[in-house]
């Protein structure tokens, strides 16, 4: 619409207090602005405020849509519980939050795909979803989305050769002088179908290229840690990748938070290390991020539990199979912290 085009108006009968009416008239007269314009601007401001608070997008067509959160679960080392965390939180987003969730298995080990019992066929997976953005973007992204055993959770299955996709992006950039990332194109295609409230990616356990590419296509990052010194160094490397992604391709990426996982609560090493790490890791963030703070060190500590290993064997989210047990309750506390952090942006 042209900038000075008249705004179409319609009758919308509401009652306001006499005091508010008098204030509107006085302000209108003082500013030389119609009361209808003042009301429009005031209502738009309130709509934006409460939409942001509720995580809702107000569309130009008048529809209100829930904001889509794209969350990467990343780590600089294996064995810290990325896949368990991704599945556990996804289930709780669905069960408690009543969200429609899409999982993306971006780890060549494809553990998340196996855990969620996706009926894989070797054709519809993440490699296909990304490569079609290059060779035939008209193929609907839904083609590569499969149901899981859970009603409101779908998945784009993993592929052991997912690392090759990164090299395709580099070749594309070299040949076409095109900086558009295939991961971003895939994510845009997913967002466009407007079917999912939460999109969660399980990434490769490293600080190299297999982790870098997914980070360029997500909004938030959650980092699980184990209570040992190597986790701090691994955290630093992953956080560097977040900063790099922010500078190169994804200016809006944020570290949502980080937490301790698989903690043997009664061991002296955990009791000594965790308080120290709660001071050390924020210092690492400040060092890498030019003095700025970022992300929440979640209060929740996920205790080590045999139930996690049982859930893996049973191909289940631990929060579904053992929700009433201690580890299930731990993850539920973490979920509440995560949703609060998302609400606060």
Task: Name what the model sees in each region.
Residues 2-12, 22-26, 30, 35-37, ...:
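P-loop NTP-binding core
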Residues 16:
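Short, structured motif recognition centered on aromatic/hydrophobic residues
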